[in-house]
Curated annotation (Swiss-Prot):
UniProt lineage: Bacteria, Bacillati, Bacillota, Bacilli, Lactobacillales
Gene, per the UniProt record: proB
Domain PUA residues, every copy: 275-355
Name recorded for this polypeptide: Glutamate 5-kinase
Superkingdom in the source lineage: Bacteria
Reaction(s) catalysed by this chain's protein: L-glutamate + ATP = L-glutamyl 5-phosphate + ADP
Binding site for substrate: 49, 136, 148
Length: 369
């Protein structure tokens, strides 16, 4: 089979009734498709929204709450109810499910990242279906992933999935908003995610949930840069998950990079927090960005920040001011300053295995639109 390990992301609009409450029939349909794929030999992960939708009614709210505390309380109640729906339906087919609640810190902190990866690997190898959501009940803004589109891409990259599928109420990426523009056409295959694609996504988003088309495209960048292809398709068809796995569903397919980022490079590119800045000369800039070389001390022009040995810093081309990438340093700021002052600096500040160049595609992730 072409796609053995698949991550499915199901959004709020694919799980709810018109009044915003959880649709048990929609949950049942999703679990039936998961069961069929599981029985066919696929390894599956489900990133599911819907905790607030499942819980707000049980707390006596007439409609989906808008206050943060009310939403967190609803999620606390609803996460258990939502998992119960999934678990009950899957157990009817003798399939074990597992709940994993994550925050951004589980990706930023290397130890927690490794632990999450190991837990997911064991679950998949033992035939369980992990059901993942952000830990909405306790997470604060500083630790939020922000949306399940991004979370699903981070998970797909972490487990080196063969495919990431976004199930939504829009059957792919269009050149315009298909609800208002009769000339809008769906893009069936996207080779590169660039500014033009980002602009298209801004006009073709879903209005439900927290993740519209723009967040899906930015999430697709994380996945495709990590070697995971992405499929955006409609959740409205009864067999959409099965057809997506078989490549027979209508939608938009995003091609993965042939040489996807390894786990260490993923962490550097998407999660590592920079503790300082380094400016380099033209020769060092070319060595890093064009030739895949390590950063030698002799190419450093200037350093800024109170970083220590092993910290991550951002490197800039002094001449152009352009950000070149991020890497792990072999010397702290004080030691580096002493060596640069002596004008006899020799050795390596950042080895190439501890370096990630910031490509135009990755740069788009950190651009506000």
């Amino acid at each position: 089979m072409k796609y053995k390990r698949i991550v499915f992301k199901v959004g709020t609009s694919s799980l709810t009734n018109e009044d915003g409450s959880l649709s048990r029939s929609k949950v049942k349909d999703i679990t039936q498709q998961l069961a069929m794929l599981h029985e066919a030999g696929h390894e599956l992960i489900l990133v599911s929204s819907g905790a607030i939708a499942a819980g707000f009614g049980a707390l006596g709210f007439k409609k989906r709450p808008t206050k943060i505390a009310d939403k967190q309380a609803s999620a606390a109640v609803g996460q258990g109810l939502l998992l119960e729906e999934y678990t009950t339906n899957l157990l009817l087919r003798q399939i074990v499910s597992a709940q994993i609640l994550l925050t951004q810190d589980d990706f930023v902190d290397k130890r927690r990242y490794k632990n999450a990866h190991q837990a997911l690997s064991v679950l998949l190898n033992r035939g369980a279906i992990p059901i993942i959501n952000e830990n909405d009940s306790v997470v604060i803004d500083e630790l939020k992933v922000g949306d399940n589109d991004t979370l699903s891409a981070q998970v797909a990259a972490m487990v080196q999935a063969d495919l990431l599928v976004f199930l939504t109420d829009v059957d792919g990426l269009y050149t315009g908003n298909p609800n208002s523009d009769p000339r809008a056409k769906r893009l069936e295959r996207i080779e590169t995610i660039n500014r033009e694609i980002i602009d298209m996504a801004g006009g073709a988003g879903s209005s439900n949930g927290t993740g519209g088309m723009l967040t899906k495209i930015k999430a697709a960048t994380i996945a495709t840069e990590s070697g995971v292809p992405v499929y955006i398709c409609s959740s409205l068809k009864s067999d959409s998950m099965i057809e997506a796995a078989e490549e027979t569903e209508d939608g938009s397919y995003f091609v993965a990079q042939e040489k996807g980022l390894r786990t260490q490079k993923q962490w550097l590119a998407f999660y590592a927090q920079s503790q300082g800045s380094i400016w380099v000369d033209k020769g060092a800039a070319e060595a890093l960005s064009q030739h895949g070389k390590s950063l030698l001390l002799s190419g450093i022009v200037e350093a800024e920040g109170a970083f220590s040995y092993g910290d991550i810093v951002t490197v800039f081309d002094k001449e152009s001011g352009k950000s070149l990438g991020k890497g792990r340093v072999q010397f702290g700021a004080s030691a580096l300053e002493d060596m640069l002052r002596s004008q006899k600096a020799k050795g390596v500040l950042i080895y190439r295995d501890d370096w990630i160049s910031i490509t135009p595609e990755i740069q788009l992730l950190f651009t506000e639109f």
